[in-house]
Amino acid sequence: MEFFTEYGEASQYQIQEVVGKGSYGVVAAAVDTHTGERVAIKKINDVFEHVSDAIRILREIKVLRLLRHPDIVVIKHIMLPPTRREFRDIYVVFELMESDLHQVIEANHDLSPEHHRFFLYQLLCALKYIHSANVFHRDLKPKNILANSDCKLKICDFGLARVAFNDSPSTIFWTDYVATRWYRAPELCGSFFSKYTPAIDIWSIGCIFAEILTGRPLFPGRNVVHQLDLITDLLGTPSSETLSRIRNENARGYLTGMQRKHPIPFSHKFHNADPLALRLLERLLAFDPKDRPTAEEALADPYFRGISKLSREPSRLPVSKFEFEFERRKLTKDDVREMIYREILEYHPQMLQEYIRGGEQISFLYPSGVDRFKRQFAHLEENYSRGERSTPLRRQHASLPRERVCSSVDSNNQDSDNEERRAISSIARTMISPPRSQEKGKNRASAYPNGIINLNSNPKIYLKSASISASTCIIRGNKGPKENGISEDMEEVVYELSDNVTRMLS
């Protein structure tokens, strides 16, 4: 059986193997035959089976089309469905990141102070940009932060994100909040206040940073009450002023009746941590949201002296209310299908113009691309379900894509000043898991995509990671026994990685 033999855009991608499987669909590693770049392709199955899930997909595609930043994961392409009104599956092509921050923390128990600082700096830069657009992420956690072995981080999974408008009723705005409890701000644990702010994301970043420092979740609550207990064990009981502003009577009563707790000095909790890091962490984890800094204020903290230059960190105008009018309406399945189709057309400019002019899709332009993918994914899934690592049958190419070696400096940050370059270089020199030999490093360097360091000209030591084998982020010669297969944890990591889509930076 041959693949990609008929006319269609799917022939641009050469599928390699399944790297993950989840409730939404299947993720496969692939090569873009036009550029030689490795990408991840996610097939989202039966998008419209549940309208709520379809709306989440629509929201994420739309939000991340509008948020274009070096520290946010990038979508490359979305394949055009064969029909406008009957399609069920979506194929999303996005940049292939090597791992996520959860795996990096688990695999690296001796991250340096330089790692700590650079990780937090990137997260706050992304958050500054996101919040400037009036977007709240609402589900920040280590598994929703992708990572490469050169310490590059990118925020992903905006399915729970919301855009804040001044005239939006807060009761409607927050009724579906279901983010991960461990990283949830205390005001969200008990519906403390009538209006929420970007401070909810700042709290999550604080929890993530604490986990980077210690290697363990800071507040692993079993339920909401236990979560509040853990928070107050560290921070102490909130002030009477804060308690008086809590609108939820049960939450206010519970905290008021709680035995008085005194805060634990962060220096006792986080041994050997940089005092400046702990001072900033205390600000990020203020119980009262009004006492937390904004992302921009946090970036101006003395902790980042030498690498931070606020004038260089991008912001953007608030997103248009028109883009998210659908959040205020009750949508049918057909409504969501049409809106998702419209978002897909953003990656097909010519078709978009025809759509805007009122013309129908010209189906013969792409008669079989998705059908080819369906057969190919079916082949891969069959082998995957048997626990086999499978490479699909495919045609032989007369000339394979050229190998590409990317610069050690992210192309999106080429205008960085010398101070930041020195900081990044210093961090890279401290990374863990060096290649076994210079010769092996030379052989592998050309295969690394997007932002991976060129070992030929700049040998550096990599972060360890328990990442998926298909990503080739880990030097293959150094694989441990856990990296030879795809564990359940890895399936979840890959699925969560693949569930996040953004528009390609122009």
UniProtKB/Swiss-Prot annotation:
Residues with PTM Phosphothreonine: 175
SUPFAM superfamilies linked: Protein kinase-like (PK-like)
Coiled-coil region(s): none
Annotated region (Disordered), positions in chain: 384-421
Motif (TXY): 175-177
Keyword Phosphoprotein: yes
Keywords, ordered alphabetically: ATP-binding, Kinase, Nucleotide-binding, Phosphoprotein, Serine/threonine-protein kinase, Transferase
Entry comment on modification after translation: Dually phosphorylated on Thr-175 and Tyr-177, which activates the enzyme.
PROSITE patterns recorded: MAPK (PS01351), PROTEIN_KINASE_ATP (PS00107), PROTEIN_KINASE_DOM (PS50011)
Regulation of this protein's activity per its record: Activated by threonine and tyrosine phosphorylation.
Catalytic activity: L-seryl-[protein] + ATP = O-phospho-L-seryl-[protein] + ADP + H(+); L-threonyl-[protein] + ATP = O-phospho-L-threonyl-[protein] + ADP + H(+)
Active site location: 139 (proton acceptor)
Phosphotyrosine found at: 177
Record's note on what induces expression: By salicylic acid (SA), ethylene and infection with rice blast fungus (M.grisea).
GO cellular component terms, semicolon-separated: cytoplasm; nucleus
EC number: 2.7.11.24
Protein kinase domain ranges (all copies): 13-304
Keyword Transferase applies: yes
Protein name listed in UniProt: Mitogen-activated protein kinase 13
Protein source organism: Oryza sativa subsp. japonica (Rice)
